[in-house]
């Protein structure tokens, strides 16, 4: 398996299909910038888009409805207006601010989705918008 959920470097979250990188493995990627880290899917199986279009009630019970994701989701309207961009850009913007290069796993729905996602690199996000 690519992800060993029992290792000291990866810890399972509420949903055991999700993991986060911590400790030595995080430090390794931060110090070795020629390596790419592939974090979990940036759009979280549509979690943020569902929240943006249908509200918090619609994502109750969703596997990505963690407190940190809900904090970010509650700010989507404010941030999409601030940066004049799409929800996709706000979500992918998180990865542009990591301390090491990230390649989010992103599944576009078509050519327009690819263009929208690529626009993320044209936006200068304020790290404070993602500090919570």
Per-region residue spans from a language model:
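Beta/alpha (TIM)-barrel catalytic core signal, keyed to glycine-rich beta->alpha loops juxtaposed to Asp/Glu
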Residues: 1-131
